[in-house]
């Protein structure tokens, strides 16, 4: 495995005229990645149970992006009036290339990189992707006596992700501010350092879709000595366009008692019109993917930040900051579209995005008499059986629709990934040149399906039984167990998402803690430095949670799977020691 990364930035600022400035910057970023995996013949033999040739798989990718911006800023100040104007242009470009190759039939297990000695090429694939974004933007601002504030802005973006006629998106915004403590009637309130009210409205855009989804592409593949060219598995839609989000925000900033107490309050409402998602299409096309602007959703919430200095002395100070956020997401409309079966559970009108549907477990079957009775009733209603593949020790699901048999229509909402609230608490203690700071991160009230349980119960991937299941599955001697029996390689209803796999994802985490020491001024002056310090930092030190898996924060991030967790790679715990120098 090899990788290298580069990022560079240059900029220039020029004062063209009095009050008129020109700014330009250019950013270049690149990332190269090469990886190879060699499977010796003996390893393949152990895995598949029969002699096999050695294999070599190589992966490589290259990514490069550029960004260039030009901006003019003008400010004019007269008396109590301050006028400002800004106009700019930006262009972003990105290009990625890569490929995956698989070779087989090496003469021995020592040829780790000599692909020329392979007897055959099992797979060869490569790709090239390009994207671009052009932007023009402007802003006008007015400030009267640092008391009344007004700002109007507009930006227009053109994205290569959309086809002709839909590439441009225009996004206006307006904001106002009132610095209340500068009013004459507040002169006697000397304990108020700052009291500012804010109100804003604006539009933003998103290109939440893969590149060139409006255009049909071809893809080639090779298997052994044969190769083929076929249509890419994406039905193009020339009508897709920018997602647009309207947001209204009310805010209040405050600071009291010489900044001993400060904070802010924000209440917002966001409405996204035409969010992009997989949509229904003609099955005869043979394509499984098709995107359209079909989802309308809203977000409303409150964000509170409160901080201060409970202690601020000559040698010792304690600074603390607490922020709490509450957000409520809701799917408002699907615009008469029927989401495909893979996505429909994640987008339920009236529910948050990512909501999980699953079966409700009635109980665990203790004898076949009960099953036979249910099957007999199901046959009377014209069904083959009550629940397919069921046996003693299995989950018996509730027939929620009352039709006499278990189908996917019996699934109900079992988990909502949206937490009741979340936030962080930062504390910094300073004693002379020594400083200790830490951040506690928390989330309360979210739910997720621990999907590992279904895989472990059924043994479909050959994995071992985890801590949650161990000693807690049904056996003839353990009939009061929470979980169904262990049956290897069986895709029964025991495998399906159900309410017994749902757990609270609340947690309290020590996100980071840093101890630092600033060198005395006398030492710094001798070293011709402006500042110097030593520090040691630990991240993700510990987590307090009832989640049974590795990490409650690593639930899947995709909309369709954000309410599930099958133990992806957890956040790593790290320790670092460093020196910070300022010249």
Regions from the PLM with identified roles:
Residues 213, 217, 294-299, 341-369, ...:
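C-terminal beta-signal and terminal closure region of outer-membrane beta-barrel proteins
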């Amino acid at each position: 495995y090899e990788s290298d990364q580069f990022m560079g930035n240059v900029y220039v600022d020029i004062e063209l005229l009095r009050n008129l400035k020109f700014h330009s910057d250019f950013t270049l970023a690149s990332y190269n990645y090469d990886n190879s995996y060699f499977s010796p013949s003996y390893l393949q033999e152990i895995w598949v149970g029969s002699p096999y040739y050695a294999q070599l798989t190589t992966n490589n990718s290259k990514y490069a992006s550029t960004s260039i911006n030009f901006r003019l800023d003008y400010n004019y100040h007269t008396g109590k009036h301050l006028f400002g104007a800004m106009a700019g242009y930006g262009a972003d470009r990105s290009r990625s290339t890569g490929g995956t190759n698989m070779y087989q039939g090496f003469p021995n297990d020592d040829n780790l990189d000599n692909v020329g000695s392979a007897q055959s090429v099992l797979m060869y694939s490569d790709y090239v992707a390009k994207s671009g974004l052009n932007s023009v933007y402007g802003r006008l601002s007015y400030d009267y006596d640092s008391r009344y504030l007004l700002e109007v802005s507009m930006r227009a973006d053109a994205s290569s992700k959309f086809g002709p006629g839909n590439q441009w998106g225009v996004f206006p915004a307006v904001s106002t501010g009132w610095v209340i403590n500068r009013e004459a009637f507040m002169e006697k309130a000397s304990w108020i350092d700052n009291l500012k009210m804010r109100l804003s409205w604006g539009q933003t855009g998103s290109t939440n879709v893969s590149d060139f989804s409006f255009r049909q592409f071809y893809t080639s593949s090779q298997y052994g000595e044969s190769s083929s060219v076929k249509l890419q598995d994406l039905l193009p839609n020339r009508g897709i366009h920018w997602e647009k989000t309207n947001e209204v925000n009310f805010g209040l900033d405050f600071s009291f008692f010489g900044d001993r107490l400060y904070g802010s309050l924000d209440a917002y409402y966001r409405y996204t019109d035409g969010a992009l998602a997989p949509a229904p299409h003609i099955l005869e096309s043979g394509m499984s993917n098709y995107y359209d602007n079909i989802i309308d959703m809203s977000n409303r919430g409150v964000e509170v930040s409160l901080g201060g200095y409970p202690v601020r002395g000559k040698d010792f100070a304690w600074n603390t900051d607490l922020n709490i956020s509450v957000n409520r997401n809701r799917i408002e409309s699907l615009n008469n579209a029927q989401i495909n079966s893979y996505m429909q559970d994640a987008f339920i009108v009236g529910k948050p995005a990512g909501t999980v549907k699953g079966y409700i477990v009635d109980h665990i079957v203790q004898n076949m008499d009960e099953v036979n009775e249910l099957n007999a009733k199901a046959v009377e209603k014209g069904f083959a059986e009550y629940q397919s593949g069921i046996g003693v020790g299995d989950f018996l699901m509730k027939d929620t629709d009352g039709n006499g048999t278990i189908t996917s229509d019996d699934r109900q909402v079992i988990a909502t990934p949206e937490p009741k609230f979340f936030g962080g608490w930062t504390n910094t203690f300073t004693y002379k040149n020594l400083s200790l700071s830490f951040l506690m991160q928390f989330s309360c009230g979210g739910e997720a399906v621990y999907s590992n349980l279904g895989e472990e119960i059924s043994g479909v991937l050959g994995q071992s039984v985890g801590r949650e299941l161990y000693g807690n599955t049904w056996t003839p001697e353990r009939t009061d167990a929470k979980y169904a029996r262990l049956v290897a390689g069986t895709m029964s209803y025991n495998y399906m998402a159900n309410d017994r796999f749902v757990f609270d994802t609340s947690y309290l985490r020590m996100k980071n803690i840093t101890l630092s020491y600033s060198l005395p001024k006398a030492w710094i002056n001798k070293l011709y430095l402006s500042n110097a310090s030593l520090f040691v930092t630990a991240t993700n030190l510990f987590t307090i949670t009832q989640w049974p898996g590795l990490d409650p924060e690593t639930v899947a991030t995709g909309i369709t799977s954000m309410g599930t967790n099958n133990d992806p790679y957890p956040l790593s715990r790290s320790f670092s020691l460093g020196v910070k120098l300022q010249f």
